[in-house]
Amino acid sequence: MDIKLKDFEGPLDLLLHLVSQYKVDIYEVPIVEVIEQYLNYIETLQVMKLEVAGDYMLMASQLMLIKSRRLLPKVVEHIEEEDLEQDLLEKIEEYSRFKTVSQALAKQHDQRAKWYSKPKQELIFEDAILQEDKTVMDLFLAFSNIMAAKRAVLKNNHTVIERDDYKIEDMMASIKQRLEKENVISLSAIFEECQTLNEVISIFLASLELIKLHVVFVEQFSNFGAIILRKEKK
């Protein structure tokens, strides 16, 4: 099965998405948490063998520098550190304004296209909605946090032998069988039983496919929070 994940328009688009989840002013977000979310996302893409563009990696190195300085004991005020953070937040704010204008122009484009018979050029800004307000990217960002924790656990297990022959179809059947018995399960609980990262990835992709097909239903009560699967819609 090919993995096709809607990407962001660039590193600032990803950062804006993460910042917007906190529902506060850009300058009031917990910057270290945002940086950790970004780094988890990039690491998960790498584990899943998805291509990561160079500008994402460059931003990751800059964010790691900000994070490391944030976590150092503050014996002396680091003016350079504050400048790095301020510069980053200003770039996110500027990108937010740019994206708002771009979306407004896209809407106007859609309206004008109704008056012409030729097909309009499609403009895409967001990834597909799976169920209600949950998108593929919402679930993937939550999944990237789980993957970060699972990687840490598996690093201490030197007896695990990786295998790459997990079939998405088999995982889908396994999830459906489990829901027949339990009605409600969390992905975290399933992942705890996994022995390899390949198994974790296969289960996540199987879950996405089941959600897309409306075979199972998904709940997430907080941003980046636990992913709950249900047999029936509430």
UniProtKB/Swiss-Prot annotation:
GO biological process, one term: chromosome segregation
Keywords: Cell cycle, Cell division, Chromosome partition, Cytoplasm
Pfam families, alphabetized: SMC_ScpA
Keyword Cell cycle tagged: yes
Annotated InterPro entries: ScpA
An example Gene Ontology CC term for this record: cytoplasm
The keyword Cell cycle appears for this protein: yes
Entry's localization field: Cytoplasm
HAMAP family in UniProt: ScpA
Record function comment: Participates in chromosomal partition during cell division. May act via the formation of a condensin-like complex containing Smc and ScpB that pull DNA away from mid-cell into both cell halves.
Annotated family: Belongs to the ScpA family.
Assembly information from the UniProt record: Component of a cohesin-like complex composed of ScpA, ScpB and the Smc homodimer, in which ScpA and ScpB bind to the head domain of Smc. The presence of the three proteins is required for the association of the complex with DNA.
Protein's recorded name: Segregation and condensation protein A
Origin species: Streptococcus pyogenes serotype M18 (strain MGAS8232)
Lineage: Bacteria, Bacillati, Bacillota, Bacilli, Lactobacillales
